[in-house]
Amino acid sequence: MAAAVSAKLVKDLRDKTGAGMMDCKKALAATDGDADKAIEWLRQKGIASAEKKSGRTAAEGAIGSYIHTGARVGVLIEINCETDFVARGDMFQELLRDVSMQVAACPGVEYVNTDDIPSEIREREKAIEMGRDDLDGKPEQMKEKIVEGRINKRLKELALMEQPFIKDSSLTVAELVKQTAGKIGENVKVRRFTRYTLGEGIEVEENDFAAEVASMTKG
C-alpha cells in the first residue's frame, strides 16, 4: 500500500482538491492509492478545496459569546468568513459556539496560532528549558534538540488551534475549522478571542472548567 502512495499521486490529488500535502497522503493511504476514493475521503472530511479557499479574504463573520454554567467564565470570539450569508448559516454558527466553548475549556490558551506568540515568550521558554538540571552533561547538539522539542510542545499548549477539539479529540481545532471551511465553501478564520474568569487575580478555589465544559457536550 505504501508503494502505491507515490509523490506523483499525492501531487495530483493536491492539484485536484486543493487539500494539504499531509491530508492527501492520509487520504491515499486510507484508500489504497485510489485517487477517486481519496477525493471522496477528503470530501467526507470536509478537507477538499479548503486549502484553496484559505487565501481568500475573509472580512465577514460574527462575534460569538459563551457564558459557562454559573456565570464564572465567559468568552468573546471573532470568527471570519467571506459572506454575511454564510455567517448567518447554521454550520458557521455551530462552529462559533463550539470554538467559544473550547476557549472556555482551555484556561491555559492565550493565542490563536503559534505564529501569534511573541518572540519574548519563545525566548523565555527557551531560557527556562536550557536551565533544567536534566540537561546537564548532555552534548550541546542533543541539548538543543531536546529544548526545541519542549519549546514546541509548550507553544502548542498556548495556541487555540493546536488544541484537541472537546467534542472529538481525534481532531484539533485547526482541523475542525478546515473541515467547516470545506463544507461551507468559504475561507474561515478564527481571528481573536478573550476569556474572562470571575474574580481573576483574586485568590479563589479553582475548579476544572475543562471537565465541566466537556461534560456538557456529552449526552
From Swiss-Prot:
Phosphoprotein found in the keyword field: no
Domain of life, per lineage: Bacteria
Subcellular location: Cytoplasm
Pfam families: EF_TS
InterPro entries: EF-Ts_dimer_sf, Transl_elong_EFTs/EF1B, Transl_elong_EFTs/EF1B_dimer, Transl_elong_Ts_CS, UBA-like_sf
Keyword Protein biosynthesis attributed: yes
GO CC annotations on file: cytoplasm
PROSITE patterns (alphabetical): EF_TS_1, EF_TS_2
Keywords: Cytoplasm, Elongation factor, Protein biosynthesis
MF (Gene Ontology): translation elongation factor activity
Positions of region (Involved in Mg(2+) ion dislocation from EF-Tu): 83-86
Matching HAMAP family: EF_Ts
Record NCBIfam families: tsf (TIGR00116)
Function: Associates with the EF-Tu.GDP complex and induces the exchange of GDP to GTP. It remains bound to the aminoacyl-tRNA.EF-Tu.GTP complex up to the GTP hydrolysis stage on the ribosome.
Family: Belongs to the EF-Ts family.
Record protein name field: Elongation factor Ts
Organism in which the protein naturally occurs: Synechococcus sp. (strain WH7803)
Gene name in the database record: tsf
